[in-house]
């Protein structure tokens, strides 16, 4: 082979090698870029996943705290309600005891309750209903009550005592025909004033 041919072959090989090196270099650079891009993307996705996880964890934490506060408040209200109801039960039992003992204070209160109810009914012929234990009390005060109601209303008022009823104390006063009736029993009064009493009981229990 001549020197010229060797040189041509050598140049061809050199060009081929150069091109091969260039291709390899580009391939390597592209490969490195792909890897770098992949790592960057993976890092971004990782951060996004972590950020999402942190947000979910924070939301869950806030939800748990919120539910705990709500449950705590509900239990506190239930406990308060239980105490208030217990206070009412105790008060009711004490009032019932006072009524059963027929104390002077109770008899005076009974008289006031009958007077108030009679004026509210506003008729001249009234019927008084009380528990059996209070029938004698009413008999002893009926003249005084009649005189008081007559004076307050300006109308001559008479009373009859009806059949005993099942109540703790107090009285029901109604017209003899039953058209108008006022319940001034202990139970009815407690029910009427319950909202106000609840507020007062709560103040004393939880101040």
UniProtKB/Swiss-Prot annotation:
Gene3D superfamilies: ATP synthase, E subunit, C-terminal, F1F0 ATP synthase subunit B, membrane domain. InterPro entries: ATP_synth_B-like_membr_sf, ATPase_E_C, ATPase_V1_Esu. One of its GO terms (cellular component) is proton-transporting two-sector ATPase complex, catalytic domain. It is a peripheral membrane protein. Keywords: ATP synthesis, Cell membrane, Hydrogen ion transport, Ion transport, Membrane, Transport. Pfam families: vATP-synt_E. Its main location: membrane. GO terms for biological process: proton motive force-driven plasma membrane ATP synthesis. Belongs to the V-ATPase E subunit family. PANTHER family: ATPASE H+-TRANSPORTING V1 SUBUNIT E1A-RELATED. Has multiple subunits with at least A(3), B(3), C, D, E, F, H, I and proteolipid K(x). This is A-type ATP synthase subunit E. It comes from Methanosphaera stadtmanae (strain ATCC 43021 / DSM 3091 / JCM 11832 / MCB-3).
């Amino acid at each position: 082979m001549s020197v010229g041919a060797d040189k041509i072959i050598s140049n061809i090989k050199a060009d081929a090698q150069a091109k091969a090196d260039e291709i390899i270099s580009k391939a390597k650079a592209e490969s490195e870029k792909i890897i770098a891009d992949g790592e960057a993307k993976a890092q971004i996705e990782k951060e996004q996943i972590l950020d999402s996880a942190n947000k979910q964890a924070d939301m869950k934490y806030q939800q748990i705290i919120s539910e705990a506060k709500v449950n705590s408040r509900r239990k506190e209200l239930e406990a308060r309600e239980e105490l208030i109801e217990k206070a009412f039960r105790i008060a009711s039992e004490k009032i019932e005891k006072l009524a059963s003992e027929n104390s002077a204070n109770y008899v005076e209160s009974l008289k006031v309750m009958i007077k108030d109810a009679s004026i509210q009914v506003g008729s001249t012929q009234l019927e008084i209903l009380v528990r059996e234990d209070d029938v004698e009390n009413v008999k002893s005060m009926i003249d005084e009550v009649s005189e008081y109601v007559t004076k307050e209303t300006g109308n001559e008022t008479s009373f009859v005592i009806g059949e005993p009823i099942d109540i703790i104390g107090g009285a029901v006063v109604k017209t003899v025909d039953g058209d108008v009736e006022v319940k001034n029993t202990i139970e009815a009064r407690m029910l009427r004033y319950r909202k106000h009493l609840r507020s007062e009981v709560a103040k004393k229990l939880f101040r």
